[in-house]
Every structure is written in C-alpha cells, then in structure tokens.
Amino acid sequence: MNKQTPMKSSGKLDYLEMPATGGTLDRLKAFYSGAFGWSFTDYGPTYSAFAEGLDGGFQADAAEASAKPLPVLYSRDLEETLRAVENAGGTVVKPIFAFPGGSRFHFVDPAGNEMAVWSE
C-alpha cells in the first residue's frame, strides 16, 4: 500500500458518480478543470473520470445516469453485500452488472437515497 494507491476497504465510500446529461459533459469538465484544476480520463464519449481526493466521474449517458450524484461504495464480495443490503431493508434497483473495471449494483435505502456498490 502506498500513498498513491490506498488499499480499498469494504463498506467505505469509494467513488462519486455525478450526472452530466443533456450535453453538459464538456462544460462540466471545463468548469471543474478551470475552477479547481481537476484533470480527467475519458472512457468513451459518455463517461469521464476524475481522481481529485475522492475518485469520481461524470455520466453523460441519460440511460445510465442517476438524477442526482451517486455515492458508490466498494465491496470485496458483491453478492454478499447485495444480500446484506436486501436483508437490512434496502431495495436493489439495478442488479449486478459489468462495466469497464468491475461490476456493481444499485440500491435505494429506506429513505429513498440511491447508492451503488462496486467490486473489481
């Protein structure tokens, strides 16, 4: 473990995904770059990631984007965590699916907040 690549920990906030729909992806990148000096890595035309303190990214694909920022937790065992979410009263709204870099699922907590959990 080094300062650049800290060890991931199950159940800890790991990633923040924010919507960038309606043609705002380039404007958001320009804004955060200009205002805060952020840099970005593009993963195709609809996703751009940042690593500025807490890693995160902007989702421009309306079919994939949440309406609000999406906190993303990390899990070493995605299926076990999905069962724990359901057993605790959460509702899975997107079952486990693959994406570049891993797999994840989305859930809604009892207050209606959507979050996701991912694993490598």
Language model segments and positions:
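Vicinal oxygen chelate
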Residues: 72-114
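Tryptophan-centric aromatic hotspots in well-structured domains and transmembrane helices
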Residues: 15, 20, 31, 36-39, ...
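Short beta-strand micro-motifs in enzyme catalytic cores
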Residues: 14, 47-48, 69-71, 103-105
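Charge-dense, helix-prone N-terminal extensions
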Residues: 2-6, 19, 34, 39, ...
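Conserved active-site alpha-helix within GNAT-family acetyltransferase domains
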Residues: 23-34, 105, 114
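Conserved short beta-strand elements that form part of the metal-binding/catalytic scaffold
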Residues: 36-69, 114-119
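N-terminal beta-strand motif that seeds the catalytic metal site of vicinal oxygen chelate
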Residues: 1-29, 69-71
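Residue-level hotspots at or immediately adjacent to binding/recognition sites across diverse folds
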Residues: 15, 57-59, 75, 84
